[in-house]
Swiss-Prot record:
Disulfide bond annotation, renumbered to this chain: none
PANTHER family: 1-(5-PHOSPHORIBOSYL)-5-[(5-PHOSPHORIBOSYLAMINO)METHYLIDENEAMINO] IMIDAZOLE-4-CARBOXAMIDE ISOMERASE
Gene Ontology CC terms, in alphabetical order: cytoplasm
Keyword Cytoplasm included in the entry's annotation: yes
Protein's name according to its UniProt entry: 1-(5-phosphoribosyl)-5-[(5-phosphoribosylamino)methylideneamino] imidazole-4-carboxamide isomerase
Membership in a protein family: Belongs to the HisA/HisF family.
Pathway: Amino-acid biosynthesis; L-histidine biosynthesis; L-histidine from 5-phospho-alpha-D-ribose 1-diphosphate: step 4/9
BP-aspect Gene Ontology terms: L-histidine biosynthetic process; L-tryptophan biosynthetic process
GO molecular function, one term: 1-(5-phosphoribosyl)-5-[(5-phosphoribosylamino)methylideneamino]imidazole-4-carboxamide isomerase activity
Record: active site: 8, 129
Top-level taxon of origin: Bacteria
Catalytic activity entry: 1-(5-phospho-beta-D-ribosyl)-5-[(5-phospho-beta-D-ribosylamino)methylideneamino]imidazole-4-carboxamide = 5-[(5-phospho-1-deoxy-D-ribulos-1-ylimino)methylamino]-1-(5-phospho-beta-D-ribosyl)imidazole-4-carboxamide
């Protein structure tokens, strides 16, 4: 199981939100590239980035910070937030991203996800953000009546690289991930599922791995708070 350290970008800074609330942002650093280097130096294999402003704006906002990170490290990087058309997808991949995450458009323009996955094999992930089993979009500001598993099934044959499942109510709350829901999703689809939201301890990581079906886990606040030691966690998961 791959551990993805997360850098959430708001106004050019590294932040963490509580349950997706932009007003409840805690700034953990003002130099995203330095944070990326710190994660690399601790042994990270991947990096997970979110353009929070972009998720609300519907277009890239923290491009300068993302580009600084890409210039600072040579790890594969995945990015979500405000990526809603083919030109933006192509632009980010051209700039060196290993993978782009499509969330809102997976609900609103599923054919774009299919087209992108066909054009860029292995480089497109679907981000499914949910509250109470229902999908939320546009920076989690809009809730839909779309069921998580139903949405995931729509992309099983599309060739997407992964599904990143975020339980919004757990995100940034340090309350533990929704292991049951994540495992159920992973067992329901034939696409690798990455857990996000609430991963707050080594025990959480081990419990996710123990399911045998979850491909990865994303953690942000727990790494910044020191609740998880990245180097020790990577060794334990190796």
């Amino acid at each position: 199981m791959i551990l993805y350290p997360a850098i959430d970008l708001k106004d050019g800074n590294c932040v963490r939100l509580l349950r997706g609330d932009m007003e409840a942002a805690t700034v953990f650093g003002t130099d995203p590239a330095a944070q990326a280097r710190a994660f690399r130096d601790a042994g990270a294999e991947w990096l997970h980035l979110v353009d929070l402003n972009g998720a609300f704006a519907g277009k890239p906002v923290n491009a300068a910070a993302v580009e600084a990170i890409l210039a600072a490290i040579d790890l594969p990087v995945q990015l979500g937030g405000g990526i809603r058309d083919m030109a933006t997808i192509e632009g980010w991949l051209d700039r060196g991203l290993a993978r782009v995450i499509l969330g809102t458009v997976a609900v609103e323009q599923p054919e774009l996800v299919r087209e992108a996955a066909m054009a860029f094999p292995g480089k497109i992930a679907v981000g499914i953000d949910a509250r109470g089993g229902r999908v939320a979009t546009r920076g989690w500001a809009e809730e839909t009546d779309v069921n998580v598993v139903d949405l995931a099934h729509r992309f099983e044959d599309a060739g997407v690289a992964a599904i990143i499942y975020t339980d919004i109510d757990r995100d940034g709350a340090m309350a533990g991930p929704n292991i049951a829901a994540t495992e159920a999703l992973a067992r329901a689809v034939n696409v690798p599922v990455i857990a996000s939201g609430g991963v707050s301890s080594m025990q959480d990581l081990m419990a996710l791995r123990a399911t045998g079906v979850i491909a990865g886990a994303i953690s942000g606040r727990a790494l910044y708070d020191g609740a998880i030691d990245l180097n020790a966690a990577l060794k334990a998961l190796a």
